[in-house]
Amino acid sequence: WSAPWRFDAVQRAGGSGFVIKGKRIMTNAHVVSWARQIIVRKYQDPKPYLAKVEYIGHDCDLALLTVEDESFFEGVEPLEFGELPKVRSTVVTYGYPAGGEEISYTRGVVSRIELSVYSHIGNRRLLSVQTDAAINPGNSGGPVIQDDRVVGVAFQGISGLENTGFFIPPPVIQHFLKDTQDGKYDGFPRVGVNLATLQNPAYRALLKLPDNNQGVRVDRILPKS
């Protein structure tokens, strides 16, 4: 409060990304959210390039960047997307965990595929893939590769658990990309209601439901649904 005219100290953070067709870079939304300036560098190239967010999906934790200087893309082949990997198949993560100048490669196995909470905004459950390949801070936004194709984008781990990382699978990525084709990102649809299960006996008694009644109760309809 002694100097209210001063801005907060600028903090530096890093992540990973990869080039896709259309001269764009894909990364995580949480890597570039609230950034005052975005600087990207190519592998083994010390030159910094200014980038800006073209599209961002906070619900699916994905973002597309464009680079002002198109010379950034010279000699760079865009990566192609593959299909959803199978459980117990092998994948390789690429990225810069904890920063560093050299890219890191980590091999792992697909452990399971299920709906899970995306921690970036914490209130959406979308399809995700769990792997035992290490995914650490700095890996975020990096590609997960199988058979020379991108089968995911690394995006989160679980604090306190070893060999447990998660990546965003192709169905979510393709939905995000298709959504941006009209020039704006609308996001993943939601049902628009809050539901309550009817398993609790006290709750069932409150609603005066018979014992053989099953289903869920609509507690609330969200605005604009």
Could you say what each language-model-derived stretch is?
Residues 14, 21-103, 137, 159-162:
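Conserved active-site neighborhood of the chymotrypsin/trypsin-like protease fold
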Residues 17-19, 51-53, 110, 144, ...:
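Conserved hydrophobic positions within beta-strands
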Residues 69, 73-74, 97-101, 150-213:
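C-terminal cap/linker of serine protease catalytic domains
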Residues 90-125:
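Chymotrypsin/trypsin-fold serine protease catalytic domain
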